[in-house]
Amino acid sequence: MKKFAFLFCAVAAVLFLAACESSPKGYSVVDGVIVFDAPARAEGQHSVLRLTTDPMPVVRVGFIGLGMRGPGAVERFTYLDGVEIKALCDLYPDRVEKSQEILAGRNLPAAAAYSGEEGWKELCRRDDIDLVYICTPWQLHVPMAVYAMEHGKHVAVEVPAAMSLEECWQLVNTAEKTQRHCMMLENCVYDFFELTTLNMACLLYTSPSPRDRS
């Protein structure tokens, strides 16, 4: 199994490099990191790829969307230290109540409750929330994430974060203008195979070729 995994990663890395070599150059290597070309940014707008924020002893979270993945996310957060669940929101009030029961079952205080079509905006406008966690239908991800960032909140959004290239850039531009984190919650990006393949590709691409070593 380990041999198969290694071969799989090696082949994937080679294919990745071949694709890079065969395509028009749209990247550069800076300090061993492949940096892809990107459109010019508006004045005062800066990349958030290496954005850092001041440490937060307690991260205050508000959840939007409690129908399918939302309740599971709420429950997982109840097991985390340094987290306070401050607000819960869904179109339907009964879903909010069910998530309140999750908090009660963990002996945690009830969160502020929001419902209806505009409740999520009220949640985003609160001044005691650091992170907005979005678990709503796909077409609502971008408008909610943008609104939250524009109101000073960091954002975690379920997959897919956006439904078009234009929407992707809308998220990027808003994150850069507001200097707020916007993370798509795709855990497979950080799995063993993906990270191993990426590291192998970077290592192969940035290491001297056998010809250069001689």
Model regions and ranges:
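Positively charged n-region of N-terminal signal peptides that target proteins for export
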Residues: 1-4
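Bacterial N-terminal signal peptides
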Residues: 8-16
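Conserved small/polar residues in nucleotide/adenosyl-binding loops
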Residues: 205-212
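Basic phosphate/pyrophosphate-binding loop/patch that engages nucleotide-derived ligands
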Residues: 174-179, 196-204
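N-terminal Rossmann-like dinucleotide-binding module
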Residues: 21-106
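A structured beta-alpha segment of the ubiquitous adenosine-cofactor-binding alpha/beta core
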Residues: 111-129
